[in-house]
Every structure is written in C-alpha cells, then in structure tokens.
Amino acid sequence: MTAEELLKARAEALGGAVQSRSDGGNWSYVLNRGETPEEAAFALVTGTFFPAVEGDVLWLRTAYTVPERAEDLPVAGERIYLTSNVFICAGTVWIDGEKVFDVPYWMDITRPDVTVAEKAEPGRTHTVCIRLTLPRLFTGDGFHYLAHIGCQAADDLAFSVAAFSEELRYAASLPGTQETLDGIRRELCARIAD
C-alpha cells in the first residue's frame, strides 16, 4: 500500500467513525397540547418523523451519561453540546432542570449549539429536555426532528480530517506535487531504514 493510499484509508476511517458517533439513542417523547407531560406518558423515540397537527407540542428528553471516551478520544474536560436540525417554531431547552435556551420562533440550535457541560465529567448524567410548539399556521401531517448530543473533541477531529483532506486536494493540484511526495517518501523510508 502506498503512502497516499494509506493516508486516504485512514482519513476515510476517521471520517466514518465521526459520522457514526451516537448519543446513545435513548431519547423519549410525548406529543400533546402543551401541558407538562406525566412521567408515564413518555415513549421511546424510534424515528425522526412525528405525526402532528397545528398547536401540538413535542416534548423530547434524555438522560445522557457522559462516556469515558467518544470515538476513541478522552471526553473528560471536553465540552458536551446539544444540536439539532432547524425547527421553525417556538422552542425551549432545559439542562439538568435549568432553562438554558428559549425562543418564541425559529429554533435553530445547529450553530450556535446549546452547552450541556462546559467540562465533561465521565459518568455524570445530564437530563436534557426539549419543548417544541408547532406554529399556528402549520400545515402537513407531521414533521422531522432529530436532536443529538455531541463532544467537542469529536467535532474538532472531524474538522481536522475534513480540512486536511481539502489541503491534500489542493496540494495535488499544484505542479510538481507527485515529485515532491516521492522525495518525501524516499526520505522517510531512508530514515526508517536507519
């Protein structure tokens, strides 16, 4: 395997690992007319589509336990965050019982996101609750919504892999790139042989 093939395979493996990261999939939900739901009313989320009509309120919650590692990266001390797709309605987020995000319309926590823990402590459990209210002019038979809890370290890795990949594409377009890479490979092989 050439150095270029090895690097490409490693970048793909890292990219795949970042794309497959998960917050555990233990979200539960209630769809009602707005009142705070009873404990027994919550059901496990099994998809991203919620059948709903105008005026319905979607409550989502999870108990997220900070893992020791995410994508083989240590999590201790890292920032943990909540993000989701954009939802054009009122939205409120509570972390550990404290209201941390509240908008009357157009809930967008794709960026900026909502901090769950500034400095993660592995083993600690955080309760996250989201309340989404469908707008009065809502049409359709439901909506798609997906919330995700992530780790800043994994995001930083994803950005680094993507940025490095783009830098390699740019470098490959420059004249003399192959000759330069061949020279670097020869030099590295000579150093390894010594």
Predicted segments, located by residue:
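Glycine/proline-rich low-complexity spacer/linker segments in large multi-domain proteins
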Residues: D96-D102, T133-L174
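Aromatic-lined ligand-binding clefts that engage carbohydrates, nucleic acids, or primary amines
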Residues: E71-G97, V128
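Generic N-terminal low-complexity/basic-hydrophobic segments
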Residues: M1-W27, A154-R191
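N-terminal regions that are enriched for targeting/export leaders
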Residues: N32-F50, W59, I80, S84-F87, ...
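Solvent-exposed strand-to-loop "edge" motifs in beta-rich extracellular domains
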Residues: T65-P67, N85-F87, T133
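Extended carbohydrate-recognition surfaces in non-catalytic/accessory domains of CAZymes
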Residues: M1-A76
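Beta-strand-rich ligand-recognition modules
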Residues: T92-Y145
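Short alpha-helical segments and helix-capping/turn motifs at coil-helix boundaries
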Residues: T65-R69, E78-R79, R111-V116
